[in-house]
Amino acid sequence: TFRAGIGECDALCNFATMAMRAVGIPIVVQTTTWTKMDLAHSWCAVLQDGKFHDFSPAYVGPDEYRQKLMTVRYLKPAKVYRNLFDADFKKSRTDDGYTTYLKSPLLKDVTAESGYPVLDLRIEADKAPSSAESLVYLCAYNYYEWKPIAIGKQNEAICEFKDIVGNNIFIIAEGSKEQELRYITAPFLVDSSGHIRKFIPDKNKLVTQELWIDKGKAPHNLHFWDVEKEYFVPISCDSITSDTTQLYTRIPDNALLWYATPHRALGQRVGFIENGQLKRTWDF
């Protein structure tokens, strides 16, 4: 239970599901891994007249909750999955040995069914895949790591994923039996039309940017994703110009950036510089 006195979302959903199914109400639990903030979320949906209606056991009733998920800027799920009552063992795919809940036979992708504006993503790998054909994982940066949110296929270095919600920043990886992810693309932004912008930093072209910090709060740390080292590299701050700004003069051009507090950077998103401003995933 959080300090606010409200239980965790998955526990609330499980409680509501058991209570409502006990009296014959058809209820399911749906889930997403956030792309515009950290961690994950679960909510319920009730079946009526052949259609599922989203609701939250703690917050909002049917239909209002789906509208909230689709319009509030820091929500907007990129993928939505439904927990099934019966396992779907008909799902078959070549297994690479990498373990993820996305492979569960009790999970169904319902992103398109839920009414979100989806697109099919097709992108070429920047690094040679380990084989001519393999599973690949679409990942979002979430609480200090890239977390898989969807499974796709790679064929001759072309990666494909179905029913993705755009206006999000992703990276694509292969999985291994050793439970490691190997990134085969640079991070990229895909907009709502499917246009792709890859973040490949130009270390020979540096830009200057003044970044804000909340008044009275600790200074932030700025990092950029190094596509060769495959981790976020810190960028030195030239000066703290006031109690609300920090000046950086050595930011690689076209870099994916992470601007976060040094301790427990929960909810502080990746982003990029555009038109002289730092845009983060909650801004679009």
Name what the model sees in each region.
Residues 176-202, 264-283:
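Structured interaction patches on ligand/partner-binding surfaces of diverse proteins
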Residues 49, 157-179, 244-265:
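Short Pro-Gly-centered beta-turn/loop motif in secreted/extracellular proteins
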Residues 134-152, 222-234:
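Short amphipathic beta-strand segments in non-cytosolic proteins
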